[in-house]
């Protein structure tokens, strides 16, 4: 029984185990199926993830490329924007400069027109004033003539003798001579006023031309700076173009390895080195070309300055020749007038003697004769007074003209000396540059700082001033000795006062020149070099000697200040001797004034600009 129970239990257990095994198999199958499903799902998810990652990577790469492109485009756009800004800035600066130039040009034109209008207005006012004065004078002369005509018409009815008629005729002739002399005095005054006006206008025009010259020089400097900037910009662009071409042609510029990066850096450094070499060579060529151009320009400027300093002004020569011809014609007319007056005076002196022999028997007309003689004496006194006044005015005009001529001579000599010194200075600079290029080529290439140079006065100015004062003093003494003996005391005193003023002015100028300009001794203790000078002496022989000296000594040599002072003293003595000779000749021929003969081609040293 127990065995059957155990068999039953075992069978039950076996059934249960089979049932469990069947269930486990079923569960295992279900798990396998679920696992395979999960694996399939996982594969699908993995594939999806890889595809998405690849897409993201592609998108990332494309985005990076796009970002790089955008950055490049942005850089190009910024560079283009900067270039456009610079171009607009340059255009704006050019427009501003052009507007400023146009403005300056218009201002200069307006100033020129204003100066011309002012000069025309001054001339019109002066001419109007002179015409008014002439009209008043002519009206007075007309009134006097009408009064004389009325008196003559009243006296025609009266019975008069031939002597009275001759005396009246002489009186009318003397009055007409007086009127002519007054008219000449007025014309000389008008001419002096016109000369003063033209001198003022010319001085204003000279100042305006100097201002225009400075403006033109500033414009030239601005143009040169702009040209240098354009050249520098062109060189930079050329270097950038060379670098870009080298980068485009370099095959080793691509790669991601370390060696490729090193190669890229080396190529970049080589490109930079090549660009620097190209820039250096271009700068060297430009520097050599600019040095050659500057050297040629300096040589040309020196030759032009020498030519300009040596040659004389043809307009000035023609003007001086015309003035000399005019003065000669005036002297000839004055000599003819003096001869006519002497003839008329002789006739008048012979006439009363013949009439006095006829009038011995006419005792009744002695009263009228005495009266007419008294009138004649009074008229002769008035004529002498008018002559004295005329001589005073002439002496004043001569003194003023002499001062003007002296000042113009000094100005011309200073201008010529300045031009010669500028030419010599330019020559010395050219020689200095040549020596530096020959012996110090490396130091010239260095950047030199701009230094200010002091312009010293030439040493010849002091001696020129002293010689001018000596000549002015000798001329004053000569003029004081040349006062004629038959001059009235009032005229002689006025003449002496004028000469004293001239001498005092000359001594003041000498003192100022001696104080202002002193000879500067060099550092080595040698005496300063000075130039030879030629003084202006109013004599034909001296002019011929000066011409010979100028033709023989074309090159300017240097002499000591002691020899120059000795020359000035010897020339002053010679001038005094010539003045004494002239005084003796003037005394020997009182009534025959000499005619001044001036050569048609005056020397270049005796010329001065006549306004």
From Swiss-Prot:
Residue ranges of coiled coil: 1-288
Places the protein is found: Chromosome, Centromere, Kinetochore
Main location, first listed in the record: nucleus
Compositionally biased region (Polar residues): 549-567
Region feature (Disordered): 499-611
Entry GO MF terms: kinetochore binding
Keyword annotations from UniProtKB, A to Z: Cell cycle, Cell division, Centromere, Chromosome, Coiled coil, Kinetochore, Mitosis
GO cellular component, one term: outer kinetochore
UniProt-listed InterPro entries: SPDLY_chordates (IPR028593), Spindly/BICDR_Dynein_Adapter (IPR051149)
Gene Ontology process terms (BP): cell division; establishment of mitotic spindle orientation; mitotic metaphase chromosome alignment; mitotic spindle assembly checkpoint signaling; protein localization to kinetochore
Basic and acidic residues biased stretches: 499-511, 570-583
Domain of life: Eukaryota
Alphabetized PANTHER family for the sequence: BICD FAMILY-LIKE CARGO ADAPTER (PTHR32123), PROTEIN SPINDLY (PTHR32123:SF9)
Assigned protein family: Belongs to the Spindly family.
Function: Required for the localization of dynein and dynactin to the mitotic kintochore. Dynein is believed to control the initial lateral interaction between the kinetochore and spindle microtubules and to facilitate the subsequent formation of end-on kinetochore-microtubule attachments mediated by the NDC80 complex. May act as an adapter protein linking the dynein motor complex to various cargos.
Name the UniProt record assigns to this protein: Protein Spindly
Phylogenetic placement of the source organism: Eukaryota, Metazoa, Chordata, Craniata, Vertebrata
Encoding gene (name): spdl1
């Amino acid at each position: 029984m127990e065995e059957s129970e155990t068999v039953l239990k075992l069978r039950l257990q076996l059934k249960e185990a089979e049932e469990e095994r069947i269930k486990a198999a079923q569960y295992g199958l279900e798990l396998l199926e679920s696992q395979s499903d999960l694996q399939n799902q996982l594969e699908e998810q993995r594939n999806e993830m890889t595809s998405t990652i690849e897409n993201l990577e592609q998108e990332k790469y494309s985005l990076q490329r796009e970002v790089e492109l955008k950055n490049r485009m942005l850089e190009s756009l910024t560079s283009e924007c900067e270039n456009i800004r610079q171009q607009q800035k340059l255009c704006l600066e050019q427009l501003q400069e052009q507007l400023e130039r146009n403005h300056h040009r218009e201002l200069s034109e307006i100033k020129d027109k204003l100066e011309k209008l002012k000069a025309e207005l001054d001339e019109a006012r002066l001419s109007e004033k002179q015409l008014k004065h002439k009209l008043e004078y002519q009206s007075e002369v007309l009134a006097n003539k009408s009064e004389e005509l009325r008196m003559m018409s009243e006296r025609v009815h009266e019975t008069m003798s031939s002597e009275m008629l001759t005396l009246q005729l002489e009186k009318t002739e003397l009055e007409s001579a007086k009127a002519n002399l007054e008219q000449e005095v007025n014309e000389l005054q008008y001419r002096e006023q016109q000369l003063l006006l033209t001198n003022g206008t010319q001085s204003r025009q000279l100042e305006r031309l100097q201002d225009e010259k400075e403006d033109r020089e500033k414009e030239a400097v601005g143009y040169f700076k702009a040209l240098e900037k354009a050249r520098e910009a062109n060189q930079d662009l050329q270097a950038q173009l060379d670098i870009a071409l080298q980068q485009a042609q370099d095959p080793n510029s691509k790669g991601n390895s370390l060696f490729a990066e090193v190669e890229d850096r080396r190529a970049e450094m080589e490109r930079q080195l090549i660009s620097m070499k190209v820039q250096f060579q271009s700068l060297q060529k430009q520097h050599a070309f600019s040095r050659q151009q500057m050297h040629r320009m300096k040589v040309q400027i020196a030759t032009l300055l020498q030519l300009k300093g040596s040659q004389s002004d043809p307009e000035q020569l023609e003007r001086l020749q015309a003035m000399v011809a005019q003065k000669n014609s005036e002297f000839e007319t004055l000599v003819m007038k003096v001869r006519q007056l002497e003839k008329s005076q002789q006739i008048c002196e012979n006439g009363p003697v013949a009439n006095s022999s006829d009038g011995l028997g006419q005792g009744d007309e002695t009263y009228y004769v005495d009266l007419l003689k008294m009138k004649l004496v009074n008229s002769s006194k008035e004529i002498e007074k008018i002559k004295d006044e005329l001589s005073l005015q002439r002496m004043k005009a001569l003194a003023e003209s002499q001062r003007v001529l002296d000042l113009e001579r000094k100005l011309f000599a200073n201008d010529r000396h300045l031009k010669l010194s500028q030419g010599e200075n330019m020559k010395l600079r050219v020689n200095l540059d040549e020596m530096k290029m020959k012996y110090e080529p490396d130091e010239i290439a260095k950047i030199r700082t701009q230094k200010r140079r002091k312009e010293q006065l030439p040493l010849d100015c002091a001696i020129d001033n002293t010689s001018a004062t000596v000549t002015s003093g000798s001329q004053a003494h000569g003029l004081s000795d040349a006062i004629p003996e038959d001059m009235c005391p009032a005229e002689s005193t006025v003449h002496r006062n004028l000469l004293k003023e001239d001498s005092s002015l000359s001594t003041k100028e000498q003192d100022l020149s001696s104080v202002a300009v002193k000879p500067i001794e060099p550092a080595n203790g040698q005496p300063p070099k000075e130039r030879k000078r030629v003084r202006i002496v109013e004599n034909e022989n001296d002019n011929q000697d000066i011409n010979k000296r100028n033709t023989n000594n074309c090159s300017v040599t240097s002499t000591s200040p002691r020899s120059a002072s000795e020359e000035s003293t010897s020339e002053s003595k010679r001038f005094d001797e010539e003045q004494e000779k002239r005084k003796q000749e003037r005394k020997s021929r009182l009534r025959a004034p000499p005619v001044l003969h001036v050569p048609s081609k005056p020397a270049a040293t005796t010329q001065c600009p006549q306004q």
